[in-house]
């Protein structure tokens, strides 16, 4: 089987096994998505979701963030790692959004990556979930799943993205990204992957997985191990 065909079958299999896969950050607006993704760096989504209701209520739009000092955000995000740096980035990004984009989150990669606190991965996540462009953002889970499946040996996120993007049509990049995140969190764990509960075990190379752990498992769909997602939109 050609690698492109296998990649397509993997995405199909994961989509069948995990029909509810979606972003787990809570947001209602484009700006809330951007802020939540910035805050999620090196932090679990659940922790971010605990912090953002108060933050979003206090700063309802880009103008509110732009008029604030980074310290004004601290009480709302103090529980998150690197909160001082993230608060500063959010304020600076909001000021640029106000001045350069009329208060609206830009919908192109170059414009997003020009904002403080926004790198390639963050921009890709925002583009995917705004439906504004095709991207395959690579986080820890996406990188691990891509390597375990045997599609890449790369550890650098940009190289993983390049090799995976070459195996899938652009219109499937965002879907594959979200499925790999969901799969990595629920089944393909870093230390003890649940190969028996994997919906695509028959297509997986199990690269780097000890033989004692990499039991064949069922090739058909499996149900996600955790509860349904919170209110983040697909």
Locate predicted features.
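Polybasic, lysine-enriched low-complexity intrinsically disordered terminal tails
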Residues: 1, 206, 210-234
């Amino acid at each position: 089987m050609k690698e492109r065909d296998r990649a397509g079958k993997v995405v199909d299999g994961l989509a069948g096994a995990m029909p509810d896969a979606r972003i787990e950050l809570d947001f209602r607006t484009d700006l809330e998505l951007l802020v939540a993704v910035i805050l999620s760096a090196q932090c679990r989504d659940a922790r971010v979701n605990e912090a953002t209701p108060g933050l979003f209520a206090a700063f309802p739009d880009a103008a509110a963030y732009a008029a604030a000092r980074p310290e004004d955000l601290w009480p709302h995000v103090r529980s998150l790692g690197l909160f001082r740096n993230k608060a500063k980035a959010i304020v600076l990004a909001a000021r640029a959004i106000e001045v350069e984009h009329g208060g609206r989150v830009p919908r192109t990669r170059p414009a997003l990556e020009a904002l403080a606190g926004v790198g390639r991965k963050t921009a890709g996540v925002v583009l995917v979930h705004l439906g504004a462009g095709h991207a395959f953002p690579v986080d820890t889970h996406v990188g691990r799943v891509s390597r375990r499946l045997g599609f890449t040996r790369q550890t650098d996120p940009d190289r993983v993205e390049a090799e995976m993007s070459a195996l899938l049509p652009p219109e499937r990049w965002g879907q594959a990204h979200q499925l790999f995140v969901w799969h990595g969190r629920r089944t393909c764990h870093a230390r003890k992957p649940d190969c028996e509960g994997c919906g695509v075990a028959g297509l997986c190379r199990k690269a780097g997985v000890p033989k004692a752990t990499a039991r064949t498992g069922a090739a058909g769909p499996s149900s996600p191990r955790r509860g349904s997602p919170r209110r983040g939109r697909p």
